[in-house]
Structures are given as C-alpha cells and as structure tokens.
C-alpha cells in the first residue's frame, strides 16, 4: 500500500469528520484536487465548493454533537481506499444517542490530493 496515498486518505477523512463537527473546512480544502468529484446516492458533483457544500449538509443541528467510529482502511487499487464509519448523533443536553448512521467512504488519491470522494449507505 503506498503509504503517502493512504496517509492522505486518512488525513482527509479525519479533516472531514472534524469539519462536520466544527464547521472548519480549511483543512479539508487543502487536501482536495480542484476538480474533485463528489459522489453520493443523491447526486454527483465536481469541484471544491461542491465538496464543501456536501459536507456542510451533513453537519448536525446545534442541539446535537456527533461522534465517529471508523473501521479499517482497505486498499482497492489504483489510488483508491475505502473505510466504513459509524456516526452517533447525541443530544447535547442529555448525552443520549438520538440516532446513528452507517456510511462507507471511498477516496481516490491522485498526485497527493483527493480527486474523488464517494459516500454510500453501508450495508
């Protein structure tokens, strides 16, 4: 597994999770190719702005906080890596889990940048 590409995939994933929690997208932008392709079950879009818009839509309302549990990364070949994530959305007032989501993420790394991001609902 090319360590630099895997490192970039892991850095991107961590930055995206932090951005969902905090609203700070600068570290995400630094890892994106200008023409990054963002694929979700609803649509496919291209560009950094589209990627940030997609991550912004995932941010929980102010009454919730989100915690992530990440699975192991898998190499898919040709600069592609996959990871499954379980997100717990907790009420800030009580700390109780209100709902959870399972997602699978694939990222493609080209020239040290994320060139493609795909989110799927995990099986």
Protein language model annotation of sequence segments:
Residues 61-63, 88-99:
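Short, cysteine-centered beta-strand-loop-beta hairpins and adjacent loop/turn segments enriched
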Residues 25-29, 33-76:
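A solvent-exposed, acidic/Ser-Thr-rich amphipathic alpha-helical stretch
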Residues 80, 100-123:
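Short beta-strand edge/turn micro-motifs at domain boundaries
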Residues 77-89:
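A short hydrophobic beta-strand element
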Residues 42-43, 81, 94-97:
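Short, solvent-exposed loop/turn segments at secondary-structure boundaries
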């Amino acid at each position: 597994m090319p360590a630099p590409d895997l490192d970039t995939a892991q850095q991107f994933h961590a930055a995206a999770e932090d951005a969902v929690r905090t609203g700070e997208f600068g570290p995400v932008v630094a890892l994106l190719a200008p023409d990054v392709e963002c694929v979700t079950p609803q649509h496919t879009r291209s560009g950094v702005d589209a990627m940030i818009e997609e991550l912004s839509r995932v941010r929980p309302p102010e009454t919730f906080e989100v915690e992530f549990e990440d699975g192991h990364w898998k190499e898919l070949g040709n600069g592609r890596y996959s990871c499954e994530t379980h997100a717990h959305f907790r009420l800030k007032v009580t700390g109780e889990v209100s709902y959870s989501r399972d997602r699978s993420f694939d990222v493609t790394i080209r020239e040290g940048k994320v060139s493609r991001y795909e989110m799927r609902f995990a099986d």
